[in-house]
UniProtKB/Swiss-Prot annotation:
GO terms for biological process: fruit development; positive regulation of DNA-templated transcription; regulation of DNA-templated transcription; regulation of secondary shoot formation. A zinc finger (Dof-type) spans 24-78. It comes from the Eukaryota. PANTHER family: DOF ZINC FINGER PROTEIN DOF1.4-RELATED (PTHR31992), DOF ZINC FINGER PROTEIN DOF4.2-RELATED (PTHR31992:SF126). This is Dof zinc finger protein DOF4.4. Transmembrane segments: none annotated.
Amino acid sequence: MDNLNVFANEDNQVNGLKRPPPSRVCPRCDSDNTKFCFYNNYSESQPRYFCKNCRRYWTHGGALRNIPVGGSCRKPKRLKVDQSSISEMVSVENQPINHQSFRQTQENNEFVRSFDASSSATVTAVPNHFGYLSELHGVTNLLPIQSFRTMDCLDFGDESFQQGYYDVGSNDLIDNPLINQSIGGYVDNLTSYCINQVEPKLQPRYEHES
C-alpha cells in the first residue's frame, strides 16, 4: 500500500497537478454577528482573504471593526457643476457685438481730423450725413478753425446729427464772398430743411358768438 501511495504522489508531481487549497471559512459569514468585519489594518504580515459572499477582507486574528454591510463598496463621488454659471458664460459669448456705434465714432473722428490739419487744406472728408457738400473739393482758403463754433447737437429733429460737427455763423458768410458764392446755395438748403422739419403750430380757433 505504501508503494502505491508513493507512485500516486510521484504521478501527481510529474503531471503538475496540485491539490486545491482547503476552503477557508469566513469568520464573518460563520458568525452570527454580521455587522462586524474581521480585518486588521495595521498588520501587514498577516495574509488577508476576500469573501465573495459578504464582500469583505478578513484575516486570522484580526480585530473586530464596526463596519456595516456594504460599507466597503463606496461609489466615486461625482463633482457637481453649477449650471447657472455655465448658462451665464454661454449667454455672454452669444451676445452680438454692436458695430454701429463704433462706426459712428470713427466717422466723427475722421471729420474732426480733416479740419485740424490746416486752415487752408482742401475739404476731403465729409460725413455721409452731408452728402450734398461733396462737391466742395476745389474750394480753398476756408475760414480759420477759430471762426467755427462747435455744436453739440444740430436741431434737425434727427438723432444722427450729433457731436462734433461745425456750424458757420451768418457774419462769417457775409464777410467772405468766396463762401457766399460757393456754398450759399447749400446754406439755403440747410435753412429750408430746418424749417420743414419744424412741426407747424396749431393756431387756436375762436368761435364766434351767435
